[in-house]
Amino acid sequence: MKHYYWEGTDTHGVQQEGALDSETLSVARENLLGRGFFRLRCWKIERSSLHRVLNNHEVTEFLLQLHRLLKSGVELDDALGFAVHEQKDRFLSFLLCRMREDLRNGLSLSSALQRYHAFPKLIGKMIEVAESSGRLPEVLGMLLEFYQFQQSIIQEQKRLLNYPLVVFSIFIALSLGSIIFMVPMFKRMYIGLGDELFWLTRVLLNLSDSLRIHPESWILATLICGALLLAIYRTLGFSWLLNLIPGGKRMRESVRMLFYSRGMEIMLSTGVHLQEALALAEEMLPRLLRKRIAPVRKAVDSGKSLREAYSMVPIFSPMFVKMIALGESSGHLSSSFARIGTQNQESLKKIMAWANTLIEPVLMILIAFGVLGFLLSMYLPLFKMSERF
């Protein structure tokens, strides 16, 4: 069966939309026409997209719409309908229609969310707790604040990378233009020097010849490198690029601990059980890091205190462990995670400010070395030629 999202008009002239499974598009249209819908538009939802996890921006938009409508007193079914109307992404519209059908069939919102892999498990679990306690709008607000905070940190990281990437790309483009069009002009002047040419000059001359005579090899190599970079980006995200800038590694670690502590804070303050909160917080981290902190959850399951569990993993600093110990002794673990998150946020601000001050001079130094190397390779042979006369 194929999946379709459709929009149409009923016999009363009211705009309607929904999700439909059918063997073909024509069968789907006949089905909808038979149910009294006209002016139909249908979009096929690829089966592979059903396994796609929504990114942070999409989750934030969904939570914003739902929280705003529920806070205004709109019923949940109507809120999902309004959210579908405001959506531009057909895949997300399809999911919302499916969720609305699940609600009409008697499922809770949390059960409907947990049926689809597109939504983070954190959202489904917190909404499940909120439904049992009657605090759905409040918990949606907490989730919205958490994901908006994540989105703001991600945007700050991207802005930090934009400047060096743009400048470096322009430098590479200008360098390639110089090698392809300017270097051949110098080659005709240096043709009589032979082995006396400066080694860097010979490298540039050979590179220029290769780019002009065999461009297809370089184009193929560029496409392969682009595909590899795209694969790395889809696997690791953009954050791996932070390793290329000063302080990038520390920044990534600080961001991970910040998201982890904030996630634990909102889950514990909502009423999620500690073991479940630890499992859900692990999923916010990269796969390799999850394996390193997995002993924390296993130690808590075996009966150890949270302080003892965290002290077993070197990733967590002594200050982190100390704050957790204070939270356990006072019975306010969520407050301890909140203080840890605040400290991590302050640390992140300092790291980003330090990185901002270093990026420009480091980039200028690298470009200066590149320009110096080009000038030396092109003009040193001129001095050797002048010595002959």
Task: Set out the residue ranges of the language-model regions.
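A short, exposed loop/beta-hairpin motif centered on an aromatic-Gly-Thr core
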Residues: 15-21
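Glycine- and small-hydrophobic-enriched helix-loop-helix hairpins
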Residues: 57-156, 249-355
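Membrane-cytosol interface motif
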Residues: 195-205, 243-261
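A short beta-strand micro-motif
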Residues: 2-10
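Membrane-interfacial amphipathic helices
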Residues: 33-67, 239-252, 256
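Bilayer-spanning, highly hydrophobic alpha-helical transmembrane segments
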Residues: 152-203, 211-233, 346-389
